[in-house]
């Protein structure tokens, strides 16, 4: 979560992520890896996973150029796993590859954000409905426990911890839906949300709203009321979209 990076809107209606040279981002990547981000080995899978997290955590900034030689040096590997990792991340939409200029971290436009939240509302609503109908053992207790931890983080004004717990709450809900395809699609949505340059939880009053919205979903899940759970989850996402746009546009 990078609440200190406030975007501006471009003339084309997008988010103006400042153009980045590769050097600064790669220096941050070296520090990130040195601080203990897990690269369990030097395989393509290991490198891909670590690079993905670096993008999602904002260490590799939107629009930053990704030079194979610099990345290979940072990861202490040859260019081969770097090249394959960039290809995989391009397939996931996290990296953009060009014919003559190499690869760069993908940036999201304002139009992308709007499209993202349309899909997110549908998918989160479906996850809530399925979770309520199936209500696996321990799910309601897990949702309530995470929400209680969020309340404590909000009281401390710990936005970073609050954001992590918010992700955990939504992961628990979609896991409770017990649909592997839905979980996969929502994982991709989460990746896109994590790439945005600010969190809605910095907006005044939003943490308390989120806690109440989560509780409404959890109570519907507890009652096994799929229709009401979906309604609350959709309302939660619509409000999230409103706040997201306010944060991005400086409102």
Kindly label every feature range from the protein language model.
Residues 77, 205, 224:
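Residue-level signal for the nucleotide or nucleotide-sugar donor/cofactor binding architecture
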Residues 135-136, 206:
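Short coil/turn segments
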Residues 193-197, 201-204, 241-248:
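Short amphipathic alpha-helical interaction/hinge segments
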Residues 51, 81, 112, 169, ...:
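Hydrophobic alpha-helical segments typical of transmembrane helices
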Residues 11-12, 157, 224:
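Bacterial carbohydrate/catabolite-sensing allosteric modules
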Residues 1-133, 241-251:
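Short linear motifs at protein or domain termini
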Residues 116, 137-198, 212-220, 228-239:
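Conserved amphipathic alpha-helical segments that form helical-bundle/coiled-coil interaction surfaces
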Residues 90-96, 189-191, 205-208:
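Mobile beta-alpha loop/short-helix "lid" or hinge segments that flank ligand
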């Amino acid at each position: 979560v990078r609440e200190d990076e406030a975007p501006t809107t471009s003339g084309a209606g997008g988010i103006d992520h400042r153009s980045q040279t590769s050097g600064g981002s790669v220096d941050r990547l070296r520090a990130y890896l040195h601080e203990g981000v897990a690269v369990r080995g030097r395989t393509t899978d290991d490198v891909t996973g670590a690079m993905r997290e670096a993008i999602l955590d904002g260490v590799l900034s939107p629009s930053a150029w990704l030079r194979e030689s610099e990345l290979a040096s940072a990861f202490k590997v040859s260019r081969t796993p770097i090249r394959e990792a960039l290809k995989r991340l391009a397939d996931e939409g996290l990296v953009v590859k060009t014919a003559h200029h190499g690869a760069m971290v993908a940036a999201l436009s304002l139009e992308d954000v709007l499209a993202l939240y349309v899909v997110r509302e549908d998918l989160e609503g479906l996850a809530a409905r399925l979770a309520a109908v199936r209500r696996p053992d321990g799910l309601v207790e897990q949702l309530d426990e995470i929400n209680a931890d969020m309340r404590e983080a909000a009281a401390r004004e710990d936005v970073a911890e609050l954001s992590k717990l918010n992700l955990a709450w939504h992961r628990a809900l979609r896991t409770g839906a017990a649909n592997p395809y839905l979980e996969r699609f929502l994982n991709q949505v989460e990746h896109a949300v994590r790439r945005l340059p600010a969190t809605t939880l910095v907006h005044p009053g939003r943490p308390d709203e989120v806690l109440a919205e989560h509780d409404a979903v959890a109570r519907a899940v507890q009652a096994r009321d799929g229709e009401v759970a979906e309604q609350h989850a959709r309302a939660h996402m619509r409000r999230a979209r409103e706040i997201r746009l306010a944060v991005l546009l400086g409102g």
